[in-house]
C-alpha cells in the first residue's frame, strides 16, 4: 500500500479524478437508473491511467491500470489528493479485514459441513451397513474395512493406528502359506469353577448338615450333664415369653428341638422357628447375599462369556501360537488378541505360550511374541497369576540355558500381569508409535494414589525416553526390522 501511494502521488501526478458508471449500457446515477460499480480514475503526466473500482454492495475492490473508458466528471469539486489517499487506504484496509473474516467464516463453515456430513452418514447408514466401517478414535473419520485392512489398519485421514486382530498380525509378519498353528484346539473349562452353581448348592448342603450335627451334639451334652428336670428348668429360663405360648408344654418343646424339620429351600422368617435354625451363621447369610447380588449383576457367568467371545472372535482363547517363515526364515510366533476378554491371560493362554517357548527351545527357533492384554484373567483367580511364573521359567531356560533369541513386541494396550512378566523379558523389546503400556491404568492409579497421571505418560514415546523399549517401529516397517534383527543375530 505504501509503495502504491509513493508511486502514485509523490511523483508529481496530475490528478484527474472522476466517478462514473462503467459499461456500454451504464446509466448515470442521477438519471435514476440502475447503479453500476463506481470507479476512481487517476492519470499521471505521461497520460497513463489507473482505475480503482468500488462495488458498494459486494465490497469488491479492483485496480485496472489499463482502463481508458471516459467517465462522467467528478461530482464533488472539493475532492482533494489527501482525501483520495485516506479513502483509498481505508477501503483497502476494510476489504483486507473483510477478506480475513470471510476466510474464517469459510473455514468454520467447512468444519460445520464436515461434521454434518459425518452425522448424516451415521444417521443414514442402517445397522447392517455399519459393520463395513471402522471409526478412527483420533479423528473420528470412518474408514472402509477392506481398504483399512489393505492399509495395515492405519487411518487414511490422520495416520493413527487401529487395533489389529491376531490373524491380521500373522498375515502382516508371516510369509503367505507358511503358517502352522500349534495347540489350536486347547480350550478353557472354567478350572476354578468361578461361577459354578453346583459348588454353591453343595456348600449350602454342608452348612445344613453342620447345623444339624451341632444341634444334636448340643442336645446330647445337655442330656448327659443335667437331669431331665434341670434341663427343662434351664431351658425354660432361656426362652422368653413371646417364644413360648402358654398352651405349649416345655416337654413338647424339648421334643421339637430334638427333631428339627425344615423343608429344603424354605426361608426362615417366622419368629417361632427354633434356635438351631437361627444359628445358621454368617457364612450362610453371605451365600444368600451373594446369590442376590448375582441375580442383580448384569455380567454373565464366566462359561457363558467364554462361549460368547468364541463365537464373536472365532478363536478359542486370547492367543494364537504357531510356527512360520518371516522373509524365508523359520520363527516361532505367539500373537495375543485383545478382542477375546480384553486379551486377559488365563490357564489356556499361559499353557499355549509355555508350550510355544518349549517348542522353540527344542527346535532352536527364534521366538517372537506380540502382546496385547489387559493382564491376568480374574475369573480364574490365582491360577491365572501362576501363568506369569510358568512362562517366565520357560523363558529363563530358553534365553539363559539355550542362549536363543527372543523378540517381544508390545502393541496397544499391554498392561497388568503380561507387562510384569514375559512382555518385558525380551532380548529386544519393540513397540509401535502411540502404544499404551502400563502395569495399572490411570483410573486404578488415581484411586490408589489419589494422583492424576496424564495419558501421554504411559504411551510409548514417553516410556522410550525412560529406557522401557529398544525400538519404536512404525507398523509398515516392522517385518523388515525383525528380519534385519534376525540377520544380525545370525539366526
Curated annotation (Swiss-Prot):
Record-linked Gene3D superfamilies: 2-enoyl-CoA Hydratase, Chain A, domain 1 (3.90.226.10)
GO CC annotations on file: acetyl-CoA carboxylase complex; chloroplast
Cofactor(s) for this UniProt protein: Zn(2+)
Region of interest (Disordered), residue spans: 252-273, 279-298
Substrates-to-products reaction catalysed: N(6)-carboxybiotinyl-L-lysyl-[protein] + acetyl-CoA = N(6)-biotinyl-L-lysyl-[protein] + malonyl-CoA
Residues annotated as binding Zn(2+): 136, 139, 155, 158
Major localization class: plastid
Localisation: Plastid
SUPFAM superfamilies noted in UniProt: ClpP/crotonase (SSF52096)
Zinc finger (C4-type): 136-158
Residue ranges occupied by any CoA carboxyltransferase N-terminal domain in the UniProt entry: 132-491
GO process terms (BP): fatty acid biosynthetic process; malonyl-CoA biosynthetic process
Protein role: Component of the acetyl coenzyme A carboxylase (ACC) complex. Biotin carboxylase (BC) catalyzes the carboxylation of biotin on its carrier protein (BCCP) and then the CO(2) group is transferred by the transcarboxylase to acetyl-CoA to form malonyl-CoA.
Subunit structure: Acetyl-CoA carboxylase is a heterohexamer composed of biotin carboxyl carrier protein, biotin carboxylase and 2 subunits each of ACCase subunit alpha and ACCase plastid-coded subunit beta (accD).
Protein name: Acetyl-coenzyme A carboxylase carboxyl transferase subunit beta
High-level lineage: Eukaryota, Viridiplantae, Streptophyta, Embryophyta, Tracheophyta
